[in-house]
């Protein structure tokens, strides 16, 4: 049996909303039914659809071609774990977050989080939870998103000011607004 590699495949989003994630997942699985693949999730961002897949590298071009039935492929990112310098990781996580790549934000920040302790660890856990909450929003899981945002607020409670280039006070305000209104909106960190 072939070894599968994990990829994030990004398709252009011309019309979909987060509530469409399950139907896009079904369509994608149907379009790719003849291939030995795993499609874990579909997440819907403003400008792209993010398909979390495991594929044989040998089938990648065929899968890419088939996925044009769902949307134009704009990026393919093979997922590999790498250790980065803390400052580089935090900068990358911020860029990913601001580009609505919340799953990858979560992954990059976890790499930093596991090497921290105390207040910094709690702060990073809060930011990771915000990213995780927004992953659920992109899957159309609004109630789960709000629930995780509440947990994030608990972790962020004791923090303020700037953490590298992240304004923690602005982050907390955005999260509080979402929790209080239960209206999920895009924001940057």
Give residue spans per PLM region:
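N-terminal alpha-helical interaction modules that lie
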Residues: 1-99, 103, 159-189
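Short coil/turn linkers that connect adjacent helices within long alpha-helical scaffolds
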Residues: 117-120, 158-162
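Inward-facing hydrophobic residues that define packing positions of alpha-helical scaffold repeats
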Residues: 97, 102, 109-110, 149-150, ...
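TPR/TPR-like (Sel1-like) alpha-helical repeat modules
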Residues: 142-160
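Residues that mark the junctions of alpha-helical repeat units in TPR/alpha-solenoid scaffolds
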Residues: 85, 118, 122-125
